[in-house]
């Protein structure tokens, strides 16, 4: 009966249900996992501001996370800013610090079309890893959420169009973010810069900014775009 009622619903409403289910379910699972940490007394936390520059890449997500970069023919790029705050120090009881973020990217389309802008919102899992044979460490981050753009980037639209006539991307898509950051305060020469100041630490690092349809959940077929670049993040 439920299947019959769903079949009678209008196309736009079915699409809305389809697009909404995945991010809502994933967010509920993540937030459910961090609720335990907050109930156990984790309060307050740090805020952080990231500014980054990223260029469109033809590289698949599988290899893009290790820095494999193949420039898109359009050579378009984005400049983004992201604000985040600590959410929890654990995820499902595991020592994985979680943060929530909102971001604003601006896209330079290199005269292929008008420039665009967008918004991202996501939850991010973080892990601090010591560099082998040293006493230094790097911070790894993996974020999952939603991305909305005022105008679909040309490199993304081309990725969909090559899959068939009339195939297009969507303004609302799934969002993934992968970061590798090097905190600067751990270096003795730079540590005095952060004493008695408003900025507790600052990092320089690599970022992958990824939009995709999640194998056709957000659009007619699978597809997406990667932007790869570098940025700075200040922790308050």
Predicted region positions:
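A glycine-rich, hydrophobic loop/mini-helix early in the fold
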Residues: 82-106
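Outer-membrane beta-barrel domain signature
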Residues: 66-74, 110-114, 166-167, 217-221
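Outer-membrane beta-barrel transmembrane domain signature
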Residues: 85-89, 100, 113-218, 234-236
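Transmembrane beta-strand segments that form the barrel wall of outer-membrane beta-barrel proteins
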Residues: 49-55, 62-70, 97-110, 204-212
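Short glycine/proline- and aromatic-enriched beta-strand/turn motifs that initiate or cap beta-hairpins
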Residues: 36-86, 218, 233
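Residues that define the transmembrane beta-barrel architecture of outer-membrane proteins
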Residues: 45, 73-79, 115-121, 171-178, ...
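Cleavable N-terminal export/targeting peptides
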Residues: 1-43
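Long hydrophobic alpha-helical segments typical of transmembrane helices together
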Residues: 220-236
């Amino acid at each position: 009966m439920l299947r019959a009622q769903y079949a009678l619903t209008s196309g736009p409403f079915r699409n809305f249900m389809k697009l909404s289910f995945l991010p809502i379910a994933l967010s509920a699972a993540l937030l459910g996992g961090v609720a335990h940490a907050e109930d156990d007394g984790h309060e307050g936390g740090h805020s952080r501001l990231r500014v980054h520059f990223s260029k469109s890449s033809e590289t698949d997500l599988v290899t893009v996370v290790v820095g494999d970069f193949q420039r898109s023919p359009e050579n378009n790029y984005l400049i983004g800013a992201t604000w985040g705050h600590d959410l929890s120090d654990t995820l499902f009881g595991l020592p994985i610090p979680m943060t929530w973020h909102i971001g604003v990217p601006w896209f330079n389309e290199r005269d292929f079309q008008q420039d665009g802008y967008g918004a991202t919102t996501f939850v991010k899992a973080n892990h601090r890893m010591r560099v082998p044979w040293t006493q230094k460490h790097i911070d790894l981050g993996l974020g999952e959420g939603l991305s909305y753009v005022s105008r679909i980037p040309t490199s993304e639209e081309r990725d969909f169009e090559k899959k068939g006539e009339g195939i297009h991307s969507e303004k609302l898509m799934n969002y993934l973010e992968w970061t590798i950051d090097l905190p600067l305060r751990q270096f003795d020469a730079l540590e005095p810069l952060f004493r008695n100041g408003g900025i507790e630490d600052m990092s320089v690092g690599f970022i992958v900014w990824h939009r995709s349809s999640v194998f056709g959940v957000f659009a007619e077929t699978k597809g997406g775009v990667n932007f790869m670049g570098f940025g700075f993040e200040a922790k308050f």
